């Protein structure tokens, strides 16, 4: 038997207009229903080709199909983190608490310094991609990353806990080519409760995956 499970588009945890005025409804609808859904369909299409190849029904260009899967799967995962990483104004925004705040203070010298560095990373991603705050299970520290496309420069082992999409489809209808203003306004909808939960999960579960049994 040859069979792979398929991916599904997750629902948003809020209405499409919930992040206004910082991200308008039109962007959210297009981004979720069209762009994210395209990555789900792309990942599933790659899996279907691999299934048919294994069954002997077709021959595939393995390299091309694997590249398609990597790109689309990563796009699906990044967006699946991105949506709950945000919350409507009043629930989102402000500053973090808990372990996230402690690590930011210890590593970056305070929230404002962290925010400035993360913002600079997101604003200067070459081409299209993501700004990422990830947990390093080996050192139990936070890392700021620039990810190009969805899967280029993503470092194996690091666990994303906060991401911002800086592909043009995430902001162009509202901010045109002003990525910087989009990034600055995005901080008003960051869901720090979600980030804290992701950090706790990573602290509890990620480290054993990358260390040899004692």
Swiss-Prot record:
List, in alphabetical order, the Gene Ontology terms for molecular function in this entry. identical protein binding; metal ion binding; superoxide dismutase activity
Q: Which PROSITE patterns match?
A: SOD_MN
Q: Which cofactor does it need?
A: Mn(2+); Fe(3+)
The note on cofactor binding and number reads: Binds 1 Mn(2+) or Fe(3+) ion per subunit.
Name the reaction it catalyses: 2 superoxide + 2 H(+) = H2O2 + O2
Highest taxon of source: Archaea
Q: Where does Fe(3+) bind?
A: 31, 79, 165, 169
Keywords attached to this entry? Iron, Manganese, Metal-binding, Oxidoreductase
Gene3D superfamilies membership: Fe,Mn superoxide dismutase (SOD) domain (1.10.287.990), Iron/manganese superoxide dismutase, C-terminal domain (3.55.40.20)
Q: Record keywords: Cell inner membrane included?
A: no
What positions does the entry give for Mn(2+) binding? 31, 79, 165, 169
InterPro entries on file: Fe/Mn_Superoxide_Dismutase (IPR050265), Mn/Fe_SOD (IPR001189), Mn/Fe_SOD_BS (IPR019833), Mn/Fe_SOD_C (IPR019832), Mn/Fe_SOD_N (IPR019831), Mn/Fe_SOD_N_sf (IPR036324), SOD_C_sf (IPR036314)
Tell me where the transmembrane regions lie: none
Q: Note one Pfam family from the annotation.
A: Sod_Fe_N
E.C. number, please?
Answer: 1.15.1.1
What role is this protein assigned?
Destroys superoxide anion radicals which are normally produced within the cells and which are toxic to biological systems. Catalyzes the dismutation of superoxide anion radicals into O2 and H2O2 by successive reduction and oxidation of the transition metal ion at the active site.
**Family membership noted in the UniProt record:** Belongs to the iron/manganese superoxide dismutase family.
* Name listed for the protein in its UniProt record: Superoxide dismutase [Mn/Fe]
User: Species name for this entry?
Assistant: Aeropyrum pernix (strain ATCC 700893 / DSM 11879 / JCM 9820 / NBRC 100138 / K1)
């Amino acid at each position: 038997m040859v069979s792979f499970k398929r991916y599904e588009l997750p629902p948003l945890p809020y209405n499409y207009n919930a992040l206004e005025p910082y991200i308008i409804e039109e962007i959210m609808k297009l981004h979720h229903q069209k762009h994210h859904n395209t990555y789900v369909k792309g990942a599933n299409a790659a899996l279907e080709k691999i299934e048919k190849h294994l069954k002997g029904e077709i021959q595939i260009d393995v390299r091309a199909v694997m590249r398609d899967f990597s790109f689309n799967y990563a796009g699906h995962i990044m967006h699946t983190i991105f949506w709950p990483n945000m919350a409507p104004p009043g629930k989102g925004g402000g500053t973090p608490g808990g372990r996230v705040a402690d690590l930011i203070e210890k590593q970056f010298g305070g929230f404002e310094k962290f925010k400035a560095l993360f913002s600079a990373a997101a604003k200067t991603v070459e081409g299209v991609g993501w700004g990422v705050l990830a947990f390093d299970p080996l050192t139990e520290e936070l890392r700021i990353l620039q990810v190009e496309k969805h899967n280029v420069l993503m470092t194996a082992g690091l666990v994303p806990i906060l991401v911002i999409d800086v592909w043009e489809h995430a902001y162009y209808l509202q901010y045109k080519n002003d990525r910087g203003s989009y990034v600055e306004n995005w901080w008003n909808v960051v869901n720090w409760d979600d980030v804290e939960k992701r950090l706790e999960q990573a602290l509890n579960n990620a480290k054993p995956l990358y260390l040899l049994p004692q």
